[in-house]
Amino acid sequence: MTAGQWRSHLTDDQQRQVRDLVTVATQVDGVAPVGEQVLRELAQQRTEHLLVEDQSPGKSAIGYLNLSPAHGADAAMAELVVHPQARRRGIATAMVRAALAKTGGRNQFWAHGTLAPARATASALGLTPVRELVQMRRSLRQLPEPVIPNGLQIRTYAGTEDDAELLRVNNAAFAYHPEQGGWTEADLAERRGEPWFDPAGLFLALEGSEGAEDSPSGQPRLLGFHWTKIHLDDPGLGEVYVLGVDPAAQGRGLGRTLTMIGLRSLTQRLGDRDLGHESTVMLYVESDNIAAVRTYQGLGFSTHSVDTAYALAAPDAALA
């Protein structure tokens, strides 16, 4: 089985085929095979695409791999999907081998949900887990009241005039993080353009007026934020999309306060829908961030699934 050719551009029809492929795999597996960033990249030319098509006259996509380039110390990252009816034909193995060959074995692979086929492919190719991202969930019922510390202002996103402070806090809070750190204005603009974006769901915690002189703009300084999201394709599901606290403001309980304010908002916004079932909120946290995991457990969250990043332990030796 060959993996096809690398492409830096996908046609509109190819993008549609990949989205359809992801939808089918999600319905069968119960977990999306790729993250939302991969779907954003389909129309861009910032990543490499590997497309495997069947031999029917329409040549529909039965396999897809997205390879994002390395950034500084962060390895190149691949995410892939194979059509459920085309599995056990070596397609995933061929795509993984192609990605390893392209990067000299120095990339990682996300396995969303860490499903059995992904574990088997990783084992067969000598890939080992290097990172785990835990998805945690809880019901939006019986939420504790948020406690807002004295001298703290809470408001929602007012527009692009908030972007500079948002970027400052985000990049300070996630300086270590491969995906969330190093954001630019373009990253914010992309997410504002998403259909789910709602400025009323982005909460800002600012220092009281006595701290205004600490901000370059002369406005109250941003201490933290909670960006919530409602999943339009999964009624009743909300998300703690990004929760960031300025490292200089940690230890004041801002994370808990912002979390509860956001969850209360999700409850109200999802409560307007006739769902027929209980509303739920999800979030992602690195498995080795023990303090954060324990904090969320204390707020009633429990593990729903785990995404695993795999890589070669010794790329040079493995590819020699």
UniProtKB/Swiss-Prot annotation:
Acetyl-CoA 1 binds at L80, V81, V82, R88, R89, G90, I91, A92, T93. It is an enzyme of class 2 (transferase). Residues 8-141, 152-320 form the N-acetyltransferase domain. 1D-myo-inositol 2-(L-cysteinylamino)-2-deoxy-alpha-D-glucopyranoside binds at E36, E179, K229, E239, Y284. It catalyses: 1D-myo-inositol 2-(L-cysteinylamino)-2-deoxy-alpha-D-glucopyranoside + acetyl-CoA = mycothiol + CoA + H(+). Acetyl-CoA 2 binds at residues 243-245, 250-256, 289-294. CDD domains: NAT_SF. GO terms for biological process: mycothiol biosynthetic process. Its EC number is 2.3.1.189. InterPro entries: Acyl_CoA_acyltransferase (IPR016181), GNAT_dom (IPR000182), MshD_Acetyltransferase (IPR050276), Mycothiol_AcTrfase (IPR017813). Keywords: Acyltransferase, Repeat, Transferase. It comes from the Bacteria. GO terms for molecular function: mycothiol synthase activity; protein-N-terminal-alanine acetyltransferase activity. Catalyzes the transfer of acetyl from acetyl-CoA to desacetylmycothiol (Cys-GlcN-Ins) to form mycothiol. Belongs to the acetyltransferase family. MshD subfamily. Monomer. This is Mycothiol acetyltransferase. It comes from Mycobacterium ulcerans (strain Agy99). The gene is mshD.
